[in-house]
């Protein structure tokens, strides 16, 4: 299941974070990082998924 979430996080980082933590602070931070740059959003999403 984590592999699927990581693949989703690579394609749509905020969706991967949302599936892991819901509408928390990490989700909104990921939205911001993705808007500022796609790569930081991916790195943050993979970190959140791997951490839990």
Swiss-Prot record:
Its main location: membrane. It is found in: Cell membrane. GO terms for cellular component: plasma membrane. Pfam families: Pmp3. The chain crosses the membrane at residues 6-26, 29-49. The keyword Lipid metabolism does not apply. Disulfide bonds: none annotated. It is a multi-pass membrane protein. InterPro entries: PMP3. The keyword NADP does not apply. Keywords: Cell membrane, Membrane, Transmembrane, Transmembrane helix. Belongs to the UPF0057 (PMP3) family. This is UPF0057 membrane protein PA0567.
